Amino acid sequence: MRGVWVSYIELDMQNETDKSEASFREKFKNIAINSKNAGFNTLIVQVRPFCDALYDSKFFPYSHILSGEQGVNPGYDALEVMCEVCSQLDLDIHAWVNPYRISTDSTPQALSETNPYVIDNEIGEETENGIFLNPANKMARNLIIDGVTEIVRNYDIDGIQFDDYFYPTQDSDFDNTEYADYVETVGEMNCM
């Protein structure tokens, strides 16, 4: 595999005057052609950057990357478009998921009312760096699994990539409750 990461920054349509499917397709096709011409055979595209989706999801709202506002349907499925373009150019495509990040201190500007954290803030934690799903929380882990399963079942992708999968803070309060439950269930001897 000779892969290249295509981040949400390269896919961003927020400042484009034309946010249509045709405009997105042209933007992505240029990325794909340039990557292929540079000798790459795989694109690793960021499809879930902020607990949102660049595809039609029953678990996550549409990403603000496509329309400028999280939760607003752009009128097309960006992942489907990217899969089609990669297939036409004989490129593999991997879906890149940021499993924990909900927001940074500035992005997105507002969370959709359908964002999983807005629906149930018990699944995440606010830190000085933003809001993140808590990987010690069972509901958060299940949400991540459900989201990846949804991608694998619904799209012709060749792989899943995780990035930014580390804890967002060193503060032990981040998962204190879950850790106490773990110690109670597993026992002190099995804890680091």
Predicted regions mapped to residue ranges:
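Hydrophobic faces of well-ordered beta-strands that scaffold small-molecule active sites
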Residues: 2-6, 43-45, 93-95, 160-162
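Active-site-adjacent "subsite" loops/lids of carbohydrate-active enzymes
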Residues: 5-26, 83, 93-154
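Active-site-proximal loop/turn and secondary-structure-junction residues that shape catalytic pockets
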Residues: 10, 49-51, 99-101, 166-168
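Short, solvent-exposed loop/turn and secondary-structure capping segments
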Residues: 15-17, 47, 55-58, 104-109, ...
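Aromatic- and glycine-enriched glycan-recognition loops and surfaces
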Residues: 19-38, 65-89
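Catalytic domains of carbohydrate-active enzymes, especially glycoside hydrolases
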Residues: 26-53, 154-159
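Aromatic-lined carbohydrate-binding/catalytic grooves of carbohydrate-active enzymes
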Residues: 38-74
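Polysaccharide-binding and catalytic clefts of secreted carbohydrate-active enzymes
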Residues: 41, 89, 118-192
